[in-house]
Amino acid sequence: MAATFVANALQAVNFLGDRFLRKSHHPFTAIEDLYRHSMDSAFAVSESFLVTGAPHASAYYPRDFAWFYPDILDPDTIMDSQDAVRRARLLEKSVRLLLEAVRANVVTTTIVPAGRARYLGVNYFSRPSDTLLGILAGLRQMISAEERASSYLAMSQCVHAGRLLLAEYCGDLKRAILQLASELEPFNDDGSTYLLCDASAPRSAATDTRAERRRFVTNACVYTTFVWGVRLGIIDENELKRRLGRDLAQYKRDLLRLFGKGGYIRHSLDGPPGSPVSSVALDFVSVHRGFWDMSEPAERALFAATADLIIAEPRFRIPGTFHFLVSADNPRNKMIHKIAAPAYQGRSSWPTFNVEFADRMLDYDEFSCSDTYRSSAQGILKDIRTATEVHGGYQELISERGLKYRTWAYKGAVAHSWFPRFLSVWRRAHGTPLLQWND
C-alpha cells in the first residue's frame, strides 16, 4: 500500500508538471527532421529505459514493447550505425530490467523508478493482461534481429545478448507464464465453458483506463503470451494444455467463437449487447505478429466484418480523414480518468492503433491474395504523416477534432519511440521507404 501511494504521488507530480511546464524546444516540421529528433531523444545514451516520451519518462510500461515499439531494430528505420548501437543497447538494458522484475515476482502494469537503482512495481487500477507479452516482445525483438538483412554489427551483438538473457531467465518466465495460466477463470455462455483472464474483474491491456470485464483485447493478449512462450522455447505446449484443459489452437477458436458470435469481434461481454458499431473497438487489432495470423478463412471473415464496421461508421473517424477513433462512444472508465483524461481510450485517435490496423489490413490482403484494404491502409498512414508534421512530432493520441489531445491535467505525449513502427508499416504498404539515410 505504501509503495502504491509513493508511486501514485510520483506519477501525479510528473504528469501535472509536464502538463504545465513542458515546452516545445524544436522548430522542425519536415518528417525527416522530426524523425531524427525523435530517435535522438528516445535512444539517447543518457536513457536507462525505453519509454514513450514525456510525460511517461518517469515510469516504465512493459506492455509497450509489444504494443508500441515491437520492431525498433528494423534496419529500414535505423539512421546510422550510432543509432543502431543506441537502440540495441537500450533495448537490452530495458529487457534485462524487466526480466529482473519477473525474477522478483513483480509482474505489474508499471515500474516506477524510486531512486538509487530502486524500483516500485505498481498496478494502476487493475492487473495487467499484457505485461508478460511485452517482456516476451522485447526478447523476440532481440533474438529475431538476425532474420533481418542488416550491415550493423550491433544487430548481431543484440541477437547474442538476447539468447543469453533467454537462457538466464527462462525458468523465471516459465513460472510467470504458468501463473498467468492458473489465473484464468471459467466463463459459461450458451452451455459452453470458456477461459477468460477477466471473467470477474477488469484487467488492463494497452493502457490502464478501461474498466470493462471480459474484453477481447485482454484475452487475446493472454493467448499471444502463451504462443510466444512456446515459440521461444520457454514452455512446452503440452504443459500448457494440461493446465488449460485444451490446446492453444482450441483456446483461440474458443475466443473467436465467444467474442465473434455476432459475426464480428465484440469488444466486451460486460453488460448487455448494444448495436454492432457501439460494440467494437479499434484495439481488436491486437499486437504485431500476435493474435491475428489470418491463416484461416473463418478468422479472416471475422476480421473483415469488424474492420468494415469501423471503416463504414462516420462516428469512428475524425471527419475528412483516415484517423480512426478507439471507440464510437466513450467507454466505462475509472473515475480518475473521467475527471483527468476523458476519452483517453474512447473517442480519441491513437496513431499506434491506426498503424496496427493498417498492418492487419495488409496481413488480410496478403493471406487472401487481394488488395481489399491496401488503399485504406495507405490512407491511414498518409494522415498520420500529416498529423506528425502539423503537430511537430509523433503523437500519442489525437482528439476527436484532430487536435493535440489536452485536458486540464494531461497534455498528450510526443511518442518518440513509436515512430519507427510507423516507418516499418509505411514501407510495407507502399513498397518503398518513406525516409532513407546514407550511413
Please report, for each region that a protein language model flagged, where it lies by residue.
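Flexible, acidic/His-enriched mid-domain "rim/lid" segments that flank
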Residues: 208-220, 224
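Aromatic-rich carbohydrate-recognition surfaces in CAZymes
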Residues: 58-189, 219, 347-364, 374-377, ...
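Alpha-helix C-terminal capping/termination sites
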Residues: 62, 74, 78, 145-148, ...
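Active-site neighborhood of glycoside hydrolase catalytic domains
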Residues: 221-252
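Extended glycan-interaction surfaces of carbohydrate-active proteins
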Residues: 8, 12-60, 93-122, 179-213, ...
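Acidic, serine/threonine/proline-rich low-complexity intrinsically disordered regions
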Residues: 233-242, 296-300, 360-375, 436-437
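Universal eukaryotic N-terminal targeting presequences
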Residues: 1-2
